[in-house]
Design a protein with these regions (language model features):
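Hydrophobic alpha-helical segments and their helix-loop junctions in multi-pass secondary transporters
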Residues: 189-217, 227-247, 406-414, 437-448, ...
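Loop-to-transmembrane helix boundary motifs in multi-pass membrane proteins
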Residues: 121-122, 158-163, 269, 315, ...
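Extracellular/periplasmic helix-exit of transmembrane alpha-helices
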Residues: 92-106, 250-251, 272-303, 548
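Transmembrane alpha-helical segments of multi-pass small-molecule transport proteins
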Residues: 128-132, 152-173, 193-194, 361-373, ...
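Flexible loop linkers connecting adjacent transmembrane helices
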Residues: 30-36, 70-75, 97-123, 178, ...
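C-terminal membrane-solvent junction of multi-pass transporters and transport-like membrane proteins
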Residues: 186, 355-365, 390-449, 486-489
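A generic transmembrane alpha-helix motif of multi-pass inner-membrane proteins
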Residues: 225-228, 425-490, 531-538, 544
């Protein structure tokens, strides 16, 4: 039962007034102004049910069509030996997404707009443009997955792709946030279809558990090929669009700092589901192809469906194809929304699922246009779908480190997060993650640019040489943690702002009232190195893709 209490709302930076009001979740409502303590388990449960959504959608949406292919490739080519990569990614997923949910609840402003305001027009424009391009390509891969599943099911590809695109547009365009969230949550629960497939294939549970816990490399496999697949797993599981989506979706759902604890639990549940799905795909694919001629010869997600149908049964193959369509639908919805939210946020345009199409034309135009273009590309004969998939994987690898750097800097920005800035140890961990992502990004970029030269020795040289970069990252982390510590003390001890004494009520003030961002020398160094890296790596990757497109790669 919700208790409505009249309170004085603090002045915040929220850019769209549709982001203020009742929390209307798929499974419950929290009234605007409800500040009553949750003293009973029943009250806590009803609150959690109302909050559920952002974490589940962003995590399960990450198990999209591209993820099906990546995890399936790992299982078909290397068995369950790479399951441990998923275990290592659990803390990375939580730390990254917890930071953005905190930013969303505390600031009320989207990720791209904060980058504009705190780091300038160059980085703001860069973040929006690269997000738009990468997301557009990612959505194409979602419809590739839908087309492959339709082919297996024997359904007309053109009709199926058009119907899927229309369904995604209609679900978001009703002007009812709760209705969209219920649609998304239905897709989330449908993703559990992977679990019965796992039991139908019945891979050896003891082996699956062992390989999930104990790291190892496939025996007799080429290190460079394995490393590239590991990078693919990382890029599939931790993607830039997730940061932008969850921050904006938390804002659109009207979640405030008072409910961050519940949103963190929502995130943990989402992580559990995404790991269960990923483990299931890798494990039952490994068991399906073990000892068969197709083992080690991955083609695409459609090939996995064919193999499951051949060796396990038609029912299991159909279930996999349906799960693939489900994954592509939720992936396309979330990725498109992350782009529309970002553009609306940057231009201070209306950008909320609470608004009808006529009340937020630009927001829905961006959303619908991305879906329509992606569907059209997949249906166009002769489209370079393989090249587009390669471009998505490579660009994601190049851009992910920069997205994490911005995230780390924003979460140490005193005027932005006040008492919610990062702890010292969180900065240490995130900096280590950035170092690892940079190394993996370099390996991925090198493999695309120089496929014939990327052998075991090159990879080892990159990993060893990366130790120096890791040391620099550690120094940056120390500098940032010092700033963060001072930020927390300043926020809590500021007697002129009583709200700062309570983390539950502290919100970022309007953007125009923020003190100018003051970057430390370490942060400025980060930005300079990052800019150089992006110019070089991005330029080389673009050149390579163009060469491949014209047949000279």
């Amino acid at each position: 039962m919700s208790i409505k209490v009249d309170i004085t709302e603090p002045v915040t930076a929220v850019l769209d007034d549709a982001h203020i009001g009742h929390i209307n979740g798929a499974f419950g409502t929290i009234l605007h102004g409800d500040v009553a303590p949750r003293k009973t388990w029943k009250h806590r449960l009803t609150t959690l049910l109302a909050i559920l959504g952002p974490g589940l959608i962003v995590m399960v949406g990450d198990n999209d069509a591209g993820a099906f292919a990546t995890y399936g490739q790992a299982g078909q080519n290397y068995g369950t030996t790479l399951l441990w990569t998923l275990a290592l990614l659990i803390p990375v997923l939580y730390v990254n997404q917890e930071m953005v949910l905190r930013l969303g609840a505390v600031t009320g402003v989207g990720h791209a707009r904060l980058i504009f305001e705190r780091f300038g027009k160059f980085w703001g424009a860069f973040s929006v443009i690269d997000l738009f391009l990468l997301n557009a390509l990612t959505i194409v891969t979602e419809f590739i997955g839908i087309a492959l599943a339709l082919d297996y099911l024997g359904l007309d590809k053109t009709t199926g792709v058009i119907v899927s695109a229309a369904l995604i547009m209609i679900a978001a365009g009703t002007g009812d946030f709760r209705r969209f969230e219920r649609f998304a949550m239905a897709l989330v629960f449908a993703s559990l279809l992977l679990v019965p497939i796992y039991f139908m294939v019945h891979p050896p549970l003891a082996q699956v558990a062992h390989d999930f816990v104990f790291p190892q490399m496939p025996v007799g496999s080429k290190l460079s090929d394995v490393m590239l697949l590991v990078i693919g797993i990382v890029g599939t599981t931790v993607a830039p669009w997730q940061l932008f989506f969850q921050q904006s979706y938390v804002i659109d759902k009207r979640i405030t700092p008072r409910f961050i604890r519940y949103e963190r639990l929502d995130l943990w549940i989402g992580i559990a589901l995404v790991i269960i799905g990923a483990v299931a795909i890798m494990a039952f694919t490994a068991a399906t192809f073990a000892g068969q001629n197709e083992a080690g010869n991955f083609t695409d997600a459609g090939g996995i469906a064919v193999g499951i149908g051949k060796y396990v049964g038609r029912t299991a193959g159909v279930m996999f194809a349906i799960a693939l369509i489900d994954a592509a639908l939720i992936g396309a919805s979330a990725v498109s929304l992350s782009t529309a939210y970002a553009i609306g946020d940057v231009f201070s345009a209306r950008h909320s699922l609470h608004r009808k199409v006529t009340d937020a034309k630009g927001f829905y135009a961006v959303y619908g246009l991305l879906i329509a273009i992606a569907a059209a590309v997949v249906l166009t004969p002769g489209s370079p779908l393989g090249l587009l998939t390669l471009a998505v994987q490579t660009l994601a690898g190049v851009l992910l480190p920069s997205a994490t750097v911005f995230l780390l800097l924003l979460c140490n920005d005193k005027p932005v997060l006040g008492p919610w800035v990062n702890s010292r140890w969180l900065n240490y961990f995130t900096s280590a993650v950035i170092a690892a992502l940079v190394l993996l990004s370099i390996i991925l970029t090198a493999s695309v640019l120089f496929p014939d030269a990327t052998n075991e020795q090159v990879i080892i040289d990159i990993l060893v040489g990366g130790g120096l970069a890791a040391m620099i990252v550690a120094l940056v982390a120390i500098a940032l943690s010092g700033d963060a510590k001072g930020g927390r003390k300043a926020a809590i001890n500021d007697a002129s702002d009583a709200a700062a004494l309570s983390r539950d009520t502290w919100r970022m003030p309007p953007l125009r009232q923020l003190a100018p961002a003051k970057l430390s020398l370490a942060a400025k160094t980060w930005m300079g190195v990052l800019r150089l890296y992006l110019v070089v790596a991005g330029g080389l990757v673009l050149f390579r893709i163009v060469m491949l497109a014209i047949g000279q790669g």
